[in-house]
């Protein structure tokens, strides 16, 4: 059975009407008024869909068995008659990104769809479907069937990781944030802005700033990162702590040479061999010579100029906050800009950034931490999302300062860990970040209920 959102694939007994955009409140209400069946299957892409054997029966039976609000499934990408399995991830409490990947179809029981659309606020042009999904999730489970129940031809689903920082999408993101903030209030996970200033100088430190570089096997880039850190200038003392996670490609030897000629350079090799990036960060921030502020520099990247650390320190001192996050420019290995260019996270506001941070997939870079705070929180020992987890935990209680000009250059190249992710790796990363959000939402609910310190 072939179906499609494209009108040229229509059938007899089908009602055709124009809706623009598909995700608006009015479009969803029009669908609800027009549908007189027991179930509604939404095709949320422009692909041609072919259901597999007994797929409809499989989905519809589970819709009642689990009182499911929404059902989605894994699928095949079909190209030139070749089928490639495409697995998705399970929906959980923290699956609140507006670009969560449901694949190409979402399956609803009509009675639940009607209930949700009747509660849907009028006027959303872009966030209607997002609001519908969040509202359904409050009352009903959202179920993934880990079976390939259809194939999709053309228009592969792409999770647009930087939509929330693209100025062209500002109107979209304002709606999404409004919907999400309302959702947090409904589930008692909304928090008020932290207002207390930190006493940044109640403790003594040998250095004001430490640049922390976790590294493993970055022979090609580590020298540039080290030189970028050591070239910083400012009205403070600083050092560089490189946590070398047992590199075996020559990186260790390069670092030993560089450390000999720089008294402010600490080359640290952890005792343990089971550390990921988060664990290496913990080694750095707990080092006896770590400065008052610990500032990120990835082993692939460099600071924009010699004033990056000074700009970060200025924000700490002015705003008396626990964390400062800058903006960065995306480039290739030769420093040529690549889309979307500058990532500045202007979606962040002092009034609601700490709530909206649960909706987006990252906080920005470079990230800098007030060392006594990050020593209490620590990073999870993982190599993806460790910074996001720490940032969310800090935002729960403390202010976060922002710098909206690019002070950091993030390079994408064939050896970079974020390049050319497989479906499996991308699913692993997304599931983990959703789990971080799940835990954070639960903690904030407990805080609001007076059950968590």
What are these regions (language model features)?
Residues 2-12, 227-237:
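Short, acidic, metal-binding catalytic loop of nucleotide-sugar glycosyltransferases
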Residues 143-150, 327, 401-407, 411:
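Catalytic beta-strand/loop signature of glycosyltransferases that borders the donor
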